[in-house]
Amino acid sequence: MRGGWTVGVPRFAILSAFDFREPAMTQSAALSYRDVELAAERLLGAAHRTPVLTSTTANKLSGGTLFFKCENYQRMGAFKFRGAYNAIAKFDDAQRAAGVLTFSSGNHAQAIALSAKLAGIKSTIIMPQDAPALKVKATKEYGGEVITYDRYTENREEIGRRLSEERGMTLIPPYDHPDVIAGQGTAAKELFEEVGELDILLVCLGGGGLLAGCALAARALSPNCKVIGVEPEAGNDGQQSLRKGEIVHIAVPKTIADGAMVTHIGEHNFDVIRRAVDDIVTVSDTQLVQTMAFFAERMKMLVEPTGCLAAAAALHGVVDVKGKRVGILISGGNVDLSRFAELMQTLDA
């Protein structure tokens, strides 16, 4: 296959396609595939061009021809590096001097901490007390200052806004930001460049950054491709939102997909999703564990529960892919080995 790996010295450019201080709706209205292309230019030499893998077994199980875009092999183990790096690469001198702040359950936390380290700036990360130990440890090792909160009783967005005002740091949320969306879309851009047009694109859905960015790429590079988001059954706020035509808020969902434990889709994200996404479906936690086992046994890959969302929809028949060319975004592979073993044992229960 074309593509493979591209690793190089990071280059941070000061660009001004968006002003972080502009009103949100002004920014999202301007978001287009051109922003994904510009993000790809900034990421060149910094992000891995992750491999696209296939599996004869997966094709037999699903009846389709599946192409797995493996962002579990991205820097820090997830697609989140793309959006975080793209956002920080656009900081002006004042923003760089003050540093960056975010809130995240894990992967965006690591992505911001690593991108900030590469840029030579400070980072403060607000993480839930029950975040996976592996993700907390990696965030600290990348140089991020970690502040914890209770995800069930405290509001991370309020904490983030308060700290941003107190410290003067730029807040880059995990998904509701135009530069984050544009960066995430580069994963689908690479996929289409490698395999050509597709019939269906399945994308993991939490807050909507990856889905929105990939939808922008799909509409430009494969106009007839059906774009489908996949979220956990316990957290189907995205599905409800798309059907109602407005953002639906839910309680914090209880699911093993910790990267999708969000209460609502972001505004920037939904602005794109309602225009460019065809459907949103859900999968069960059991299906996620079974898909994790499939990746480990058949494709020799370690994939976290959230990273299995899109693949689970194809492998378990939630989306009919028979006779179709299907792109599948594997969003990440950051799972504690002890947690992985624990989840595998549930299959024998």
Set out the residue ranges of the language-model regions:
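PLP-dependent amino-acid enzyme catalytic core
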Residues: 21, 25-349
